[in-house]
Amino acid sequence: MSLLKEFKEFAMRGNVMDLAVAVVMGVAFNKIVTALVDGIIMPCVGLLLGGINIAGLSFTVGDVQIKWGNFLQNVIDFIIVAFAIFVLIKLINLLQRKKANEPEPVTPEIQLLTEIRDLLARNSSKI
């Protein structure tokens, strides 16, 4: 089997494609959350704290500037993304649990076979 054919089979497998879609959606979702944090949440927090720009907060040690405001903004960004993923996983697990608890519908063939089994059991007990 050629290397190219093996790679194609690997890439087209369900799990790899699911992972690729998840990564693309994750990157897009991260951009949305970053825009939310940078454009809405942090300016509101800065306004509540007296109109300061949180992302611009820093202090200097010697010739080095420590930008702790930018770090704080990224921590808030991470917390929002992590919480959203947590909620999504909880929802998926809940839906899977509900689906697992549902009884499987009985097909007509199974119902007929069950009736035949019951009739045979009754007839054999009469003998």
Curated annotation (Swiss-Prot):
GO CC term, one of those recorded: plasma membrane
Keyword set includes Ion transport: yes
Family annotation (Gene3D superfamilies): Large-conductance mechanosensitive channel, MscL, domain 1
Transmembrane segments: 9-29, 32-52, 75-95
Pfam family, one: MscL
Key words, A-Z: Cell inner membrane, Cell membrane, Ion channel, Ion transport, Membrane, Transmembrane, Transmembrane helix, Transport
Places the protein is found: Cell inner membrane
InterPro entries: Mechanosensitive_channel_CS, MS_channel, MSC/AndL, MscL_channel
An MF annotation (GO) of this entry: mechanosensitive monoatomic ion channel activity
Main localization category: membrane
Highest taxon of the lineage: Bacteria
SUPFAM superfamilies according to UniProt: Gated mechanosensitive channel
Signal peptide: none
Record-linked PROSITE patterns: MSCL (PS01327)
Membrane topology label: Multi-pass membrane protein
Similarity comment: Belongs to the MscL family.
Subunit structure: Homopentamer.
Function: Channel that opens in response to stretch forces in the membrane lipid bilayer. May participate in the regulation of osmotic pressure changes within the cell.
Record's protein name: Large-conductance mechanosensitive channel
Source organism phylogeny: Bacteria, Pseudomonadati, Pseudomonadota, Gammaproteobacteria, Legionellales
